[in-house]
Design a protein with these regions (language model features):
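C-terminal and inter-domain tail/linker signature
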Residues: 2-165
């Protein structure tokens, strides 16, 4: 009887079924989107055919090439230099992470994925977001990101705050 072989198989089985730290994967993904911009590193956190949907502005991408193009042309390395993210809460499930956060920045450039076609206004923005990331194993399958577009438009001066509030 080969007892060491049985122990090795048991150890491999446990490692295979070990849950992934989805929160850490989420953090790594966001790091490469905003803090240390790197499209290729961002894509490595995702499945082969992911999708990203920024619901309020109907921006994002479908499939590897669509998401990579979106990150390259609209998001990664394209945010204002003073962008800050404040994490409010996180809920982690078996295969999903939901984050509530506040994104702060000065509208000093066109932000294609949020305000397509809108030139810089120089206004400060403080915008709550909800991010839903679905995972397949240790890779992100999709992202759904929500914010209040009317609040964003009011903060950059494109919507009368009296009308909005």
């Amino acid at each position: 009887m080969n007892n060491s072989g049985d122990k090795k198989r048991q150890r491999q089985r446990k490692q295979h079924h070990r849950p992934h730290d989805l929160g850490a994967i989420f953090e790594k993904h966001v790091k490469y989107e905003f803090e240390d911009p790197d499209v290729e590193a961002t894509m490595k956190t995702m499945v082969k055919e992911p999708y990203v949907h920024h619901v309020p502005a109907l921006t994002g991408g479908i499939g590897y090439n669509g998401v990579r193009d979106f990150y390259t042309n609209q998001l990664v390395g394209k945010m204002p230099a003073d962008t800050k993210i404040q994490h409010i809460s996180r809920t982690v499930g078996k295969d999903q992470v939901v984050d509530e956060l506040i994104l702060r920045f000065t509208h000093d450039r066109e932000i294609k994925f949020m305000l397509p076609g809108i030139p810089p206004t120089g206004k400060s923005v403080e915008l709550p977001h909800v991010v839903v990331m679905k995972f397949n194993g240790n890779k992100i399958a999709h992202e759904h990101i929500y914010w209040d577009q009317a609040s964003l438009l009011a903060q950059v001066g494109l919507l009368d705050k009296k009308t909005y509030l």
